[in-house]
Amino acid sequence: MQNSRTLRRLAADHAQLHNDLPTNYLFPPNPQHDDDLSQLDVLLAGPTHTPFAAGVWKLHLAIPDNYPQQPPTANFRTKIFHPNVNEKGQICVETLKRDWDSKLTLRDVLVTISCLLIQPNPDSALNAEAGALIQQDYDAFAQRVELMTSIHASIP
């Protein structure tokens, strides 16, 4: 059960998102968790000039009861081939782990995740195959990303 401080903070973070959603993000047409501030579904369009550019991914944030002291968890609900995302869609980024700061907002979290599509971090790979491929042969990695994007996340 979330306390009043957490609910106020969540309301402020959601208001910020509705007023200033980061670039490349959209709210889905029929959000599943529209009345639950502890759950957030957004769509992330791949950044231009990246192998992800032709795709749109559904992203889910689950906000814990003790937010902002504890970070939200983030999962891709659409399959993505990325060094920092495992098969279950879980995202590995230090901002949501060791580097979390209670001053960070949900908007900051979304910006951090979109930056991972621009600059993957193979040194903290959850997907070992993608991490090795990006380090050994970026062109082959980009081709694989484009193929997986066309299969799972293509823009209709």
Q: What function would you assign to each model-found segment?
A:
Residues 1-156:
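UBC/E2-like fold recognition across ubiquitin and ubiquitin-like conjugation systems
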